[in-house]
Amino acid sequence: MARRLAATVALLTTVSLVTPISAFADAKKSVANIKCRSVKASAQTPMKVNPPTNLLKRGPRTITLSTNCGDIVIQTDFKAAPITLTVLSTLMSAGYYNRTFCHRVTNEGIYILQCGDPTGTGSGDPGFGYRDENLPKAVEDNYPEGTVAMANSGPNTNGSQFFIVYDDTTLGPNYTIWGRVTSGLDIVKYIAAGGVRGGGGDGQPLRTITIDRITIRS
């Protein structure tokens, strides 16, 4: 079953915000500077990786996704999501994510870029699952801009797929939050701005982005 995110229907309260015009100009300039290398990566059979048997004593502090469009740096929250980050560290250290596509982008209702499936179909996983942790409350914008969380197909079905939120998003409180993007969110916004292949608001990004390698710093 494809690991898909279901948008939550919520009553939204309109709030008047005053944002300097310069802020929008800076954001557009940042996205305009993104350059992506052409890549020849293709769909892969998920690498066989054994699940970890013990939690890490010292988890990663930052995780850097080196992509064909630049680096995306994630500050992790090991204290809140030790199981998730132990598993992800195991997969990342094994090279599970190397040369894989970010296969899904959404720009209607929810605003995410989804990665972590070597098959590129949305159904790939490492062959094992693990429980949820660090779930947010069921409130508006409970997955704010910059959030990094696990994708799943139901309770306690986490695998390898994760998503990056590029604009404040409201979802059911069902997806483990394990980090926050501190650098490179402009790359995600650039991919999202390119739209969906074939049109629509949910699907394969028209602008290709692949994870070349991942660097973990503890």
Pin down the residues of each PLM region.
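Cyclophilin-like peptidyl-prolyl cis-trans isomerases
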Residues: 2-8, 12-218
